[in-house]
Amino acid sequence: MAVKRFYKTFHPEHYDLRINVNRKNKTINGTSTITGDVFENPVLINQKFMTIDSVKVDGKNVDFDVIEKDEAIKIKTGVTGKAVIEIAYSAPLTDTMMGIYPSYYELEGKKKQIIGTQFETTFARQAFPCVDEPEAKATFSLALKWDEQDGEVALANMPEVEVDKDGYHHFEETVRMSSYLVAFAFGELQSKTTHTKDGVLIGVYATKAHKPKELDFALDIAKRAIEFYEEFYQTKYPLPQSLQLALPDFSAGAMENWGLVTYREAYLLLDPDNTSLEMKKLVATVITHELAHQWFGDLVTMKWWDNLWLNESFANMMEYLSVDGLEPDWHIWEMFQTSEASSALNRDATDGVQPIQMEINDPADIDSVFDSAIVYAKGSRMLVMVRSLLGDDALRKGLKYYFDHHKFGNATGDDLWDALSTATDLDIGKIMHSWLKQPGYPVVNAFVAEDGHLKLTQKQFFIGEGEDKGRQWQIPLNANFDAPKIMSDKEIDLGSYKVLREEAGHPLRLNVGNNSHFIVEYDKTLHDDILSDVNELDPIDKLQLLQDLRLLAEGKQISYASIVPLLVKFADSKSSLVINALYTTAAKLRQFVEPESNEEKNLKKLYDLLSKDQVARLGWEVKPGESDEDVQIRPYELSASLYAENADSIKAAHQIFTENEDNLEALNADIRPYVLINEVKNFGNAELVDKLIKEYQRTADPSYKVDLRSAVTSTKDLAAIKAIVGDFENADVVKPQDLCDWYRGLLANHYGQQAAWDWIREDWDWLDKTVGGDMEFAKFITVTAGVFHTPERLKEFKEFFEPKINVPLLSREIKMDVKVIESKVNLIEAEKDAVNDAVAKAID
């Protein structure tokens, strides 16, 4: 049943917000004065966890009711048309990382806090009464007061204009925007600023626990990104400022608040002198993602949450397009292939997965659609597909039309397709409808029929059990031979294979560039032809070959055993993209072996075979003038060599640790995680783990923290494992925002798995209370399913999670993840012997 939209009762035009935050008492007091148009009585205004002290309409007190289950204030205005509604309220300041909340950090041994906000999806209503729906755009004037101390500053969407005699900081009126994009923060902060060539103020803010140089990288990327987007979109950035704020506690990765973008520290700050290239790429893409939203999401906003993909999918594509423009030598589209494409293809093959666009009626269901592999990754693949069909000139022309016609308003997916269609003869809406409205993706079977004709068929691809509902897609084939641009039918006949092959002069392949969202199963004739010419393939083609074979093996359409020889063939590649694909596939072989079994010993020998020549070539130390490719290949090879228990690698890593034990943070960031992991696994005890945990608490360097966490959770020491689990609920050690990563690290560790699994089952109520209202909560289920692959764990997983299947935020995830584990259990049972035989043969 559809839930009533509050916007139908009242259209806000302007908010005057007066908010007073007291950190000591953990209270929020304020007034929300809303000017707008009354369309229905009673008027419905959102609130959550508030005490409503009074409501006035046009200066007169009126009757109201607070309806907690609807998160509503029901106001009998007695008027229609223009009205001013003034609501006085109070609310608690909580540690939930939603609404207005404190972030905690240490500086010179003292605990401190800054206050920040997180209002997406429906948490603005915890900060001030409002019509908390994307379509209810309005302007906002903010006056902010707090228990201010010397040296503290306040930030908001717009610049500060004055501090009044009562201590309220006043900010410029915003442009017309949605409530979920309002943001403010205050506390003791350091900053660095610059201006774009058009005069927009760019700033980066962080706590003083960080070294000033950690702000430099973000400042440079943010400035250049704003300039890039203004040119690409042919639409000016409409605000006077773009501030980037790192919050010590933040549930999401980052949030695109207009003019005041908030981030986890790990996704904004880095040491420019000692951060891996991969981490620099990651931080750059997070920043450019959020800044892409300043147009796509903020300037033009989805009309309702069922078009969330319109915000996220486009920003996800633009983060790569912009970074490629800013840093072309990074070859950032390769990262798109290894992260977004891989994530989308894996997730979208499970029966029961959501489509990109799905109907949402109840706000309780909104957070459940934030499936990053679908809304972000698959959605961005759809737009990459559109870009490859249109070309950049037509894309830019269509986007300019879109922004010109919808700026400061709301839009739907159809509005975007209509805009893009003005720049092309293609019916973009018709092509995209099949991809957005239905889940999954096709496998295209390419085969030479008995009559010698090359034929293509499409059907939905599943990993695990799946119900074939006869779905059909409009597939951009991207063929390297004479073939239709779009495959619309279930089956097509392309004519004589012999003629097509002769005309092409090379093996025939589909989805060249891996930009379309489908995989290909070639028959033996076509597959053998491709393998005969495999050395001529470029890195993306090789990645795609391994990717499709891996997925077909996961779907039991081919055997994993048949892929093992190809891993050996690609082992000497000088492409980090190919090496990534190689070890992504090799990692899947681990599920077929029992820990410490003879089969695992053989698998470790295979890893040694795959990595030893590369380790010998690259060594452990980064060489002056080394190529970016070699810098990025080294971590894969060192990790593989350590898994293989290569004695020389273990010795080399131990020596590096010993020589740098007094300053581990200064270790080269490209090798640091592997040095630390090796030490913990092969030479460490509970004492070392305790030392590294203290180091984790001490440092403010986000990437170093990640390395320390990876090392600590890899321990074999049972006493250390017990201590780690004991710290899961100690926010002074493990912040709630980082808890899922700690849990996943220990769960994936054979020695720590039982302790981690026992903890989440025993302390689920605590976990629910701590992070249960957050969109990231379901990740605890996702990562558990990602690790489990045995019948015993499947049984335990179902026993624990299936009773929770009616929780809206968790329901889809639980159902899907049962299928994920079931598919692995069935695959292992069917393939285990063949895979282990293939591994034994490869090392013979």
Curated annotation (Swiss-Prot):
Q: How is the cofactor bound?
A: Binds 1 zinc ion per subunit.
Q: Does the keyword Protease apply?
A: yes
Question: So what does this thing catalyse?
Answer: Release of an N-terminal amino acid, Xaa-|-Yaa- from a peptide, amide or arylamide. Xaa is preferably Ala, but may be most amino acids including Pro (slow action). When a terminal hydrophobic residue is followed by a prolyl residue, the two may be released as an intact Xaa-Pro dipeptide
- One Gene Ontology cellular component annotation held by this UniProt entry: extracellular space
Record-listed substrate binding positions: 120, 253-257
> Effect of altering residue 44 to F?
In strain: 53/7
Q: Which family does it belong to?
A: Belongs to the peptidase M1 family.
Q: What is this protein called?
A: Aminopeptidase N
Question: What organism is the protein native to?
Answer: Lactobacillus helveticus (Lactobacillus suntoryeus)
